[in-house]
């Protein structure tokens, strides 16, 4: 089991009015999976293992946690204080939470593959994920490069 309470606290800080209806919305489940994956990439160890699935990174352990806490997840009913490290990640997540589900899919896939800073990231994603538009992938890569940086 991971630390879903930390993930939810970070999301609440990043976007206080965020709602994730994981019981009824596939897109909301996808968004939460991608948010947590990106938090991990930002250096926050939440204890979830991710595998590659059709729509990008997926953690069965995270799915178990959010289904077991569906009401807490939906309204972000959490009152936990963030540590300094968590607050830094939450600040960066403010831009991430504004991405659409398909943009999140593109960004998380690029991160999973290690392509964020590659010149041909757009072409690579287009080849493996042809259902994503060029605009979605470009926006995702742009946000990713701003938020996570390139080394």
Task: Describe the residue ranges of each PLM region.
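Domain-edge interaction signal
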Residues: 1-151
């Amino acid at each position: 089991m991971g630390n879903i309470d930390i993930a939810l606290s970070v999301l609440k800080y990043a976007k206080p009015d965020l709602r994730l209806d994981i019981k009824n919305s596939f897109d909301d489940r996808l968004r939460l999976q991608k948010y947590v994956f990106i938090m991990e990439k930002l250096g926050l160890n939440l204890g979830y293992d991710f595998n590659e699935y059709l729509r990008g990174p997926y953690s069965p352990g995270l799915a178990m946690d959010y289904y077991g806490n569906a009401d807490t997840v939906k309204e972000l009913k959490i009152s936990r204080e963030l540590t300094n490290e968590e607050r830094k990640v939450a600040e960066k997540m403010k831009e991430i939470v504004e991405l659409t589900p398909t943009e999140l899919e593109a960004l998380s896939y690029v991160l999973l593959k290690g392509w964020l800073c590659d010149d041909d990231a757009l072409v690579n994603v287009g080849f493996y994920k042809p259902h994503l538009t060029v605009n979605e992938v470009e926006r995702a890569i742009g946000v990713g490069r701003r938020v996570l940086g390139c080394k």
